[in-house]
Amino acid sequence: MLIKKMICEVDAANAEAFAKAQSQWEALSHISGFIKQAGGWRKTIDEPLTAEIISVWENREAYDHFMENEHDSIYEENDQKAVILSIEVTVYEEDKPFVHDLLHNPDIRYEPNWTVLKA
């Protein structure tokens, strides 16, 4: 399985706008090879706020196809870029048993509206 981990810094004034934009990724549910995406805010009181999102894909080919053909239109449509101070993206392979742990991190306050499941 392919894992995409996104860590975004957002200032407190834009937290609501970021959360709203993140909840608009439901189009992922119909993308071939997509499995699940979940995320939320790290449990800290520090500024800026840090959002962590994990996306799970069947394989690298499905993910690459999504990035080449669908990602930019979704990202531009929800205007999320305007509220992100910084973003760090890591993509790596992971065995299926470890995916559950990635999606249930005790240091993250998960936002239900950010979760997208395969249709």
From Swiss-Prot:
It holds the Pfam family DUF4937. This is Uncharacterized protein YdbC. It comes from Bacillus subtilis (strain 168). The lineage of its organism: Bacteria, Bacillati, Bacillota, Bacilli, Bacillales.
